[in-house]
Amino acid sequence: MKKLVYLISPGKINKKFYNSLNAVLSQGNVKFFQLRLKKIKANRFLKIAKKIKKITSRHKVKFIVNDNFNLAIKVKADGCHMGQLDGSIKIAKKKLKNKILGVTCHNSKILANKAIKNKVSYLAFGSFFKSKLKPNARKANLDILKWAKKNIKKPIVAIGGINNFNYKKLIKSGAKYIAISSFIWDNPKLKPELAIRKFK
């Protein structure tokens, strides 16, 4: 199975989550797992992150921390993902050294070129479809993926409302990875380990 999924955590982590994550990652199509928790104390975050790191390492999945490069370094994550409002990408790159650094570029060629100048590891574009995770996210269209495929040598991640019916057009347009969260963790019809199998 191709490793094309960039999996994002649910907004809240409970005790059952770790077994569920283990089952999902054992399906073999996840390349990255991003821990994205807002409004959480640092010590609680570190506890959760350490447990997750053990699971991602077991499955050879890259562990990415959202927003906070200092926490990413502390938990020995493989890298950090930053939005445009999460602080200086230049400083993050300096601190993270050879770790993975990904940046959200929305639907913007200007932001993409700026990210490339800062030597990021991958670029994320979106939101391509309506997303439960970020209902008010800026919209992106497929043209940005086609442009990125032609002009950017770094891997491209597509974000926003992605499901088993729409992901293939993103891959065809130029995305190397597809970022998924709600379809896996909040799926009313499928358990997470079955939902992840829809992306081959």
Language-model segment annotations:
Residues M1-S9, G87, A92-K94, K149-K150:
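N-terminal small/glycine-rich loop or linker at the start of catalytic domains
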Residues Y6, Q84-A92, A124-A137, Y167-K200:
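Glycine-rich phosphate-binding active-site loops on the catalytic face of alpha/beta enzymes
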